[in-house]
Structure formats: C-alpha cells, structure tokens
Amino acid sequence: MNTIAPNLDGKHLRIGIVQARFTNEIGSEMLKVCCRTLQELGVADENITVATVPGALEIPIALMNLASSEKFDALIAIGVVIRGETYHFELVSNESGAGVSRVALDYNIPIANAVLTTENDAQAIERIEEKASDAAKVAVECANLVNLLLEEQFEDEE
C-alpha cells in the first residue's frame, strides 16, 4: 500500500486569501492569525496575496478570479456570518459555502474555507485562532498534496 504523508512545508507555495470585510474586526484578526501561521509554515510573505470583498457572498467571485489566474497553489476564504433574526443567515452561509466548493472543483485548486457561521459574536471570537490557523495548515497541506498528485499523474503519462 502506498501512503502519502501530510506535508506542511509551505516553502515555495503561493497562497491567495479572500477576506470578507463584513464583521471586519473578527475577519481582520482571522487574517492576521492565518498569515502568521502561513509564515510559520514557511510561506514567504511575498507569496501571500490578500484580496478583500464586502461580504461572504462576494468571496466566491474573488476566489474564482484568483484561481483562474493560475498564480496560486491554494486559496483561503475568510469571513464571518453571524445569525440574525431573518432567513438571510442561512442564505449567505449556504450560498457562500457552495460557491467556495464550486470554485475549488471547477479550477482544481485547494480552498480552505474559514468562513465562520455562528450564533453570535462571542462564538466567532472564540473560534478566531483555531479556525484561522487550521485554514492556513489545510491550504498548505492540500496544496502540497495536489501538486504531488499532479506530478505523479504526469509522470505516469510519460
């Protein structure tokens, strides 16, 4: 049996991040944690590109444009959707998540989805560190995995 071990070496990887500015204080803190973790994993600061959008519904279109540029090994979506008193929470959460997944599959690029969906600000604040750090690790690990699988695929074709 062949097993591919997880690889968290971010050296030489190019990572794109899209951050929703709605609930910006939480999102901005998530961005800081995510970038710090990427750097700890070896991703060079000049290899991290950050784009911001108004809200979670706009994240997929920005991700799609970053993915179509073919300049990135992985992408990260950062945002916060907090339940209100209307159905809008479900709509935004579901549509944003579906859009992120569609971009990943359509463009064959790993996307770490760090869009928090919580009942209140306190829950979101409690999850900043873990969710943002995990997103960085997921992006690096999955970028390395996809790159390795693509290399093996092309080697098999030769």
Swiss-Prot record:
InterPro entries linked to this entry: LS, LS/RS, LS/RS_sf
The residues the record assigns to binding 5-amino-6-(D-ribitylamino)uracil are 22, 56-58, 80-82, 113
- Keyword tags: Riboflavin biosynthesis, Transferase
Q: Which cysteines are joined by disulfide bonds?
A: none
* Pathway(s) where this gene product acts: Cofactor biosynthesis; riboflavin biosynthesis; riboflavin from 2-hydroxy-3-oxobutyl phosphate and 5-amino-6-(D-ribitylamino)uracil: step 1/2
Q: Which CDD domains match?
A: Lumazine_synthase-I
Give the GO molecular function terms: 6,7-dimethyl-8-ribityllumazine synthase activity
EC no. given is 2.5.1.78
Q: Report the PANTHER family cross-referenced here.
A: 6,7-DIMETHYL-8-RIBITYLLUMAZINE SYNTHASE, 6,7-DIMETHYL-8-RIBITYLLUMAZINE SYNTHASE DMRL SYNTHASE LUMAZINE SYNTHASE
Instruction: Please state what the protein is called.
Output: 6,7-dimethyl-8-ribityllumazine synthase
Origin organism is: Neisseria meningitidis serogroup C / serotype 2a (strain ATCC 700532 / DSM 15464 / FAM18)
Q: Please name the taxonomic classification of the source.
A: Bacteria, Pseudomonadati, Pseudomonadota, Betaproteobacteria, Neisseriales
